[in-house]
Regions:
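Periplasmic/cell-envelope proteins involved in peptidoglycan metabolism and beta-lactam response
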Residues: 1-166, 170-175, 180, 184-187
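Short, conserved phosphate/pyrophosphate- and ester-handling motifs at nucleotide-, phospho-/glycolipid
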Residues: 192
Length: 194
């Protein structure tokens, strides 16, 4: 009976350890449910999109770049489920089955991730979208790299609207949705590209 219980415990440790380590109650990674310590997220040119400063996540200084790349990098609270900070949180925190989050505690940050996105192109696409709801995606057809992914509506993480969760007018509808990855858009005439 003891061996069976130990076996179940060991199996659960192996199969669920990442979930336990990434739980929002883990004070090594989260403060009040927000990711506070992780590696940098960079664009293809090395421009920092998100970093850790003084125990909290800091986004790019350029407001237009923050707005344009928010759905791709994600928010620290995890509302944008398809963002890098949520989808790759085990990698940016440096989690491993062998060491857990020890390296995060030892070095003060996790692993950096460099995206194929170009932040300046995303900024131009965001400005071109204006006040329209939609998405812009640019892909290198030879390599499959995503050069630009922009989704609107968006918000500035440094000035999040206070009524975002209580609004009934619909102006924030889909604000946490990355329309490029999760939108229900029918492809147009895709053969023209070829």
């Amino acid at each position: 009976l003891f061996l069976a219980g130990s076996g179940v415990l060991f199996f659960n440790l192996i199969t669920h350890s990442e979930e336990w380590a990434m739980n929002k109650a883990n004070k090594h990674l989260y403060t009040s449910g927000s990711l506070t310590t992780a590696g940098d997220i960079l664009d293809i040119n090395g421009k920092v999109l998100v970093t850790t400063k003084d125990g909290s996540r800091s986004y790019n200084e350029d407001k237009s770049i923050r707005l344009a790349t928010l759905h791709t990098v994600g928010d620290s609270s995890g509302y944008i489920a398809s963002g890098v900070q949520t989808a790759f949180k085990d990698e940016i925190t440096g989690y491993s089955l062998k060491d857990g989050v020890y390296n995060l505690q030892r070095y003060g940050k996790g692993n950096d991730i460099t995206l194929t996105l170009n932040a300046e192109i995303c900024k131009v696409a965001y400005n071109a979208l204006g006040n329209y709801k939609g998405t812009v995606g640019v892909m290198n057809y030879k390599t499959g790299e995503l050069i630009c992914v922009v989704s609107t509506p968006t918000f500035d993480v440094y000035n999040k609207p206070k009524d975002i969760h209580t609004d009934t007018s619909g102006k924030y509808e889909g604000i946490y949705l990355n329309r490029f990855f999760s939108g229900l858009y029918t492809p147009g005439s895709t053969f023209k590209v070829i």
